[in-house]
Regions:
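Catalytic domains of carbohydrate-active enzymes, especially glycoside hydrolases
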Residues: 29-48, 52-53
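Structured loop/turn residues at beta-strand edges in well-structured enzyme cores
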Residues: 6, 40, 103
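Small-side-chain structural scaffolding
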Residues: 10, 23, 29, 39, ...
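Substrate-binding/catalytic cleft of secreted carbohydrate-active enzymes
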Residues: 44-241
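N-terminal carbohydrate-binding accessory modules
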Residues: 1-37
Length: 241
């Protein structure tokens, strides 16, 4: 970024705001969110299948957070689905027009874990670049569940693996569901060590790689959080367990 190699330590943001049920609409609230994130070393937010309100970008400009927005899709892209395609393209161009001047708005993806017509995805990204070439564009986050590897036409690759390969040689995160990788991946099937890294996997991509949803593993709940649920979301699951 601006000539400097930049390491992203990211936050998966799925628009989860338990007290209100919607994202904050003011800069002050978002600054507090980002300041908390920064205290954990986070400098990048990936918005899962949504674009946050303008206040979020304004706050990110101040706090130095890089934003990846996404179109609201978790599914498949097909040239035959005209209504969906028209909706998504309208959303994309409005996002670029209304949010594009914010320096924190660095990346835009087509959605989450998409499948479908890559040529159509590539055509859309070409249109976005022609409309506004200030941003980086991707086909989506973890498209084809990583099995497709690096595909020409996108500026960066967000994925859990860089294509298929023997063992865990293409993995760029440690934890997998047992249906997605042998015995649940590196975290679940190897001994703790300080020698494993993702150098070989990253080398298989000709463009920058962002590891997709790295924190997918079980944790024991903190029952002290029960008292914090004073808004629209009720923690029935925590009460049961």
């Amino acid at each position: 970024i601006n000539g400097f190699k930049t390491f992203l330590r990211g936050k998966h943001d799925a628009c989860v705001f338990p007290l209100t049920g919607y994202a904050p609409m003011d800069v002050k609230s978002w600054r507090k969110v980002f300041q908390t994130a920064k205290s954990y070393g986070i400098n990048y937010y990936r918005c899962h299948s949504y674009t946050p309100p303008r206040a979020a970008f304004a706050a990110a400009d101040i706090e130095g957070i890089y934003f990846q927005a996404e179109l609201p899709l978790w599914g498949s892209i097909s040239p035959d689905n005209h209504r969906l395609n028209d909706f998504l393209l309208n959303e994309a161009y409005m996002t670029l027009d209304y949010m594009g001047n914010h320096p924190s708005f660095t990346m835009l993806g087509l959605g989450n874990q998409l499948g479908g017509d890559v040529d159509l995805m590539r055509n859309w990204l070409d249109g976005f670049r022609k409309h506004d070439n200030r941003h980086l564009y991707s086909f989506g986050s973890n498209n084809f569940l990583g099995w497709g590897g690096a595909i020409d036409g996108e500026d960066y690759l967000t994925t859990c693996r860089v294509g298929g390969g023997e063992g865990y040689t293409t993995h760029v995160r440690s934890s997998f569901a047992f249906v997605d990788a042998e015995k649940g991946g590196i975290l679940n099937n190897t001994r703790p060590n300080t020698r494993a890294d993702y150098t070989a996997a990253i080398a298989k991509s000709p463009r920058p790689v962002i590891s997709h949803e790295t924190g997918q593993f079980q944790i024991y709940p903190d029952y002290k959080e029960l008292e914090k649920y004073t808004g629209v979301l009720h923690p029935y699951n925590l009460e049961i367990f």
